[in-house]
């Protein structure tokens, strides 16, 4: 296998696997009974267009194909930021008093997407140019004024989301703090990785791997995660060995912990 096929198809294959994984997570979240399922469904779907766009960019053999990939990528990032904002509002409900951002912020995202889509006519947002990377021709971004606006909008809204998630993490009870803090750290890592890609002007956006991982983490912690180990440590010295049966339920009615007496009572010990 020559260098062209090895580097391009390896990353394209990784991106395709991430897309399929995110699609599975999204569909499973939509079928789940939790209210968060809908928010997770849309967020995981939103991660797919940027990854798809970068897969197209990586394998592009001509400028037109690379341009198509870039448009999918940039408009997809607006979709990601919007759904990340909506997910944060749903996920952090109860630990925050206000919305993540005022309602008019979503119109900024619409305006940004529109100004990107008219770039073929105006040429104000970005262009691409070829470069040689590992002895192969790739296409890299040449940012213009519209691209600067795009980055200001997306990074600005992401900062609001990150601050809101940070506040929710601080306010969360010790039992559930882990489910907030891990996603918060993952968001920080992904944003730093994306920033490095922009600064380095690399022809391959490896931060898309982080986007895929973040989507899986969101699915797991929003839908399936239960703080069993911490609950067991906190409650073992209080009611684990008591004679009375003790059940611990979430606000949505899901049993997450029982002591020995309760286990014997329901036949699960």
Predicted regions and their residues:
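Juxtamembrane membrane-water interface segments that cap and precede transmembrane helices
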Residues: 1-2, 130-148
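Interfacial "cap-and-anchor" motif at the non-cytosolic start of specific transmembrane alpha-helices
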Residues: 2-4, 167-238
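Individual alpha-helical transmembrane segments in multi-pass integral membrane proteins
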Residues: 3-21, 33-122, 148-155, 205-211
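Alpha-helical transmembrane segments of multi-pass integral membrane proteins
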Residues: 27-53, 71, 102-107, 143-199
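Transmembrane alpha-helical segments
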Residues: 81-85, 162, 218
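Membrane-helix interface motif
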Residues: 118-133
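Sensory modules in modular signal-transduction proteins
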Residues: 229-262
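PAS/PAS-like sensory domain cap-loop motif
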Residues: 262-269
């Amino acid at each position: 296998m020559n260098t062209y096929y090895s580097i391009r198809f390896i990353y394209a294959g990784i991106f395709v696997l991430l897309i399929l994984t995110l699609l599975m997570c999204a569909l499973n979240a939509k079928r789940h009974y939790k209210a968060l399922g809908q928010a997770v469904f849309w967020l995981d779907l939103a991660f797919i267009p940027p990854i798809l766009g970068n897969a197209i960019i990586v394998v592009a053999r001509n400028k037109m194909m690379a341009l198509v990939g870039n448009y999918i990528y940039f408009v997809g990032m607006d979709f990601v930021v919007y759904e990340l904002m909506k997910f944060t509002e749903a996920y952090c409900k109860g630990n925050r008093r206000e919305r993540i951002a005022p309602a008019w912020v979503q119109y900024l995202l619409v305006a940004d997407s529109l100004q990107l889509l008219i770039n073929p006519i105006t040429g104000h947002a970005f262009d691409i140019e070829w470069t040689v990377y590992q002895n192969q021709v790739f296409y890299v971004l040449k940012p213009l004024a519209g691209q600067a606006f795009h980055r200001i909008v997306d990074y600005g809204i992401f900062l609001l989301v990150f601050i809101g998630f940070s506040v929710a993490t601080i306010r969360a009870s010790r039992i559930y703090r882990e489910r907030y803090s891990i996603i918060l750290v993952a968001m920080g890592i992904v944003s730093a990785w994306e920033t490095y890609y922009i600064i380095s002007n690399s022809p391959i956006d490896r931060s898309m791997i982080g986007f895929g991982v973040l989507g899986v983490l969101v699915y797991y912690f929003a839908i399936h995660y239960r703080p069993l180990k911490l609950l067991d440590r906190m409650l073992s010295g209080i009611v684990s060995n008591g004679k009375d049966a003790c059940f611990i339920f979430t606000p949505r009615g899901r049993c997450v912990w029982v002591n020995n007496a309760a286990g014997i009572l329901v036949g699960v010990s």
